[in-house]
Design a protein with these regions (language model features):
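The feature captures the beta-strand-to-loop junction immediately N-terminal to the Walker
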Residues: 12-14
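H-loop/switch region of ABC-family ATPase nucleotide-binding domains
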Residues: 157-158
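Conserved ABC ATPase "signature" region
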Residues: 64, 76-93
Length: 196
């Protein structure tokens, strides 16, 4: 499986088909039993709500912590912190410990940080299915903007509408294997026919 620089690829399949496992392999959270995984470029991911956040830190402290983990200097973080907070729309809650956040608030903070760490590759695993419709739409618009900038994105979702709107290429996984890989319209049509 090769994903080219600048591609926006969606992974689809029923629960348990291997979509999230593939993303975890790409981020090296887990390692393959055989074969190798290579990534070229700086990678950021949104895989599980709350992953990478220190629960006792405030949202603001977590911005600094996460951005530093991704290699941003304190000076770069200082320049971006207001943009991150503004995009997240967390307002005064940014100074509360993240353990007090709802799932939607976690998603707001995680997405806002992820789009501001200068990553070349963005992996997103269904995290955008939480939160309110307004913020989901805002994230979707930002992803379209990142796509136009030539960022590489791999996106897992069960929303076929999102797949059709965002992805150049779709990979249908079934029992850990690629069932179909190609043009989004064709793959989605086959997937919908088969899973009805």
């Amino acid at each position: 499986l090769d994903i080219k620089k600048g591609e926006t690829v969606c992974l689809i399949g029923t629960n348990g088909s291997g979509k999230s496992t593939l993303l975890k392999l790409m981020t090296k959270i887990i390692y393959p039993n055989e074969g190798t995984i290579e990534t070229h470029g700086k990678l950021t991911s949104l895989l599980e709500l709350g992953a990478g956040f220190h629960q006792d830190f405030t949202g603001r402290e977590n911005i600094y912590f996460n951005a530093a983990v991704f290699g941003l200097t304190k000076a770069k973080i200082e320049k971006r912190v207001d943009d991150i907070i503004e995009f997240s729309e967390l307002g005064e809650f940014i100074d509360n410990p993240v353990r007090t956040y709802s799932s939607g608030m976690y998603m707001r903070l995680a997405f806002s940080v992820a789009i501001n760490v200068d990553a070349d590759i963005l992996l997103i695993d269904e995290i955008l299915s939480v939160g309110d419709e307004h913020f989901q739409n805002k994230c979707f618009k930002k992803m379209l903007e990142l796509k136009k900038q030539g960022k590489t994105m791999v996106f897992v979702t069960h929303s076929m509408e999102s797949v059709k709107r965002l992805c150049d290429r779709t990979i249908w996984l079934y029992n850990g294997k690629i069932r179909m890989d190609g043009d989004t319209k064709e793959v989605v049509e086959e997937y919908v026919k088969e899973t009805r």
